[in-house]
Amino acid sequence: MRKAFTRIRLRNNRYAAYIIGFSFLAVSIILGISCGSLHIPIPAVFRVFWHQGFGGSIGSDDPMYTNIMMNIRLPRVVLAALVGAALSIAGAAFQGLLKNPLADPYTLGVSSGASVGAVVTLFLGLHLPVIGGFTLPVLSVAAALATMAAVLFFSRLVHASMSVSTLILTGVITNSFLGAFISLIIALTGDNLLPIVHWLLGSVSMRGWSYVILFLPFFLLGTILLIINGRELNVMTYGEDKAKLLGVSVQQRKMMILIAGSLLTGSAVAVSGTIGFVGLVIPHITRLLWGTDHRHLLPLSALLGAGFLVLADLLSRTIIEPIELPIGIITSLAGAPVFALILIRQHRGGRSL
């Protein structure tokens, strides 16, 4: 009874939910900046931030700390936070739209399209003169957008209203086909396999501010589009017919949500590789803590996902120093048992996911 009462209080206190979410993200960012092969004391972290923002004197060690923080750790932490937020909010939106608790950002196959773009770039050693070092993420984003267009076109071709089942099956077909294409390239790669495998397992290392700047427009556009559709997502979870009766332009809103979620997913995969379980588990945890209202579920999922991926990246580079593990390994090792516990908890409580 007490647990149920506590859960109801958490769900009804939205201010507390956002305070917890922002606090979790802030603590994760500070830890992500402070911890590493060279430990930066937390007071020094705040001094450097203060100096960057307002000027003033700094300690004798702070110039070194400033260089490490601003050029290495902070862009890495910011990119991890943005990718985690993007995957989580896209996962929450797809689970609501498709009415499928097992849906995640990769359901529609857009991530496979982004992966094909990256793998082909690595396999052929492409380096376009106009975009230089941005060749891989730019071509990956382009492949993701092309895949999204193909999935939506095929879904509409099969079923004019793009039913949920049609979208899911189209995603399965796309994932299978593009996954086979990736496997073919891997089989043909030979001894130069490591860069492709490392990219596919996900990482935010050695990215820098340029990757943050490249990803940020897609993140802002996709996130804003999803959040402004929170009320419509609430209505559409009860069925498209009821949503139409309540005045929701179902096809227009569905297309907007699909495009926004696909933009977030494709661009996230383009800059970080494939990172599993974030977009599947984080929305379930958020829903369990603070309810199913998408007006709050979406931004709260983004906050928790951002903090989670920052901590996962921290573990990936510190748990077996000096070896740095791909971040996708950490998220899968952490996400799989957590999702299993959520599943057991829900079924013991007599509720479905």
Curated annotation (Swiss-Prot):
It is a multi-pass membrane protein. GO terms for cellular component: plasma membrane. CDD domains: TM_ABC_iron-siderophores_like. Keywords: Cell membrane, Membrane, Transmembrane, Transmembrane helix, Transport. It is found in: Cell membrane. Pfam families: FecCD. GO terms for molecular function: transmembrane transporter activity. It comes from the Bacteria. InterPro entries: ABC_BtuC-like, ABC_transptr_permease_BtuC. The chain crosses the membrane at residues 16-36, 77-97, 106-128, 140-160, 167-187, 208-228, 263-283, 296-316, 323-343. The keyword Zinc does not apply. GO terms for biological process: siderophore-dependent iron import into cell. The keyword Ribonucleoprotein does not apply. Probably part of an ABC transporter complex. Probably responsible for the translocation of the substrate across the membrane. The complex is composed of two ATP-binding proteins (YvrA), two transmembrane proteins (YvrB) and a solute-binding protein (YvrC). Belongs to the binding-protein-dependent transport system permease family. FecCD subfamily. This is Uncharacterized ABC transporter permease protein YvrB. It comes from Bacillus subtilis (strain 168).
